[in-house]
Amino acid sequence: MSQGILIFQAIVTIACIAFVLAAGIQKSNRLSKLMLIVAFLCLIENAAYLMEIQADSISAILLIMKLRYIGVAFIDTFFLLFCMRYTHKKIPKHLVGVMLVVDILVMISAWTSQYHSLFYRDIYYVTAGSLTYLHRVYGPVIYFNSVYETVQIFACAYLALKGWREA
């Protein structure tokens, strides 16, 4: 089973590379640039996750997780900005600033997770039969970020449906 997950993640990473290349070739306007940023952030997250599931120590996994959060922290914000631009909706600049500050704080929290329990409360290996996996006890920043990203994704879906209705 773990080999299947590894193959699937490799395919997703290759698809992200292709998407970044395709977005980079497109005519350069602000919408294309936003989509290229989203694609690049997805590539960072998926490539890091591919490395994470192959890592064999907690220290390696934590290092790769920090790399992964460069993508994770910003994907939803830039996708929301893309959806706003695509549907010709205005977003106040101060709101964009607040969203980017939240993303930066989440990323900093991930990068400094070894010094506090706001991101992960505990991390340890668990063996269940022949399967060994890493168990993570999440801290409040992970839960906050999950709710924050969910709100952003619902906003993207709302904008897409509203744009589709108006078309």
Please provide the spans of the model-predicted regions.
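C-terminal ends of transmembrane helices
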Residues: 18-27, 83, 161-163
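Individual alpha-helical transmembrane segments in multi-pass integral membrane proteins
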Residues: 2-15, 28-118, 138-151
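Juxtamembrane membrane-water interface segments that cap and precede transmembrane helices
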Residues: 123-140
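Membrane-helix boundary/juxtamembrane motif in polytopic membrane proteins
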Residues: 138, 160-167
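Membrane-water interface of transmembrane alpha-helices
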Residues: 155-159
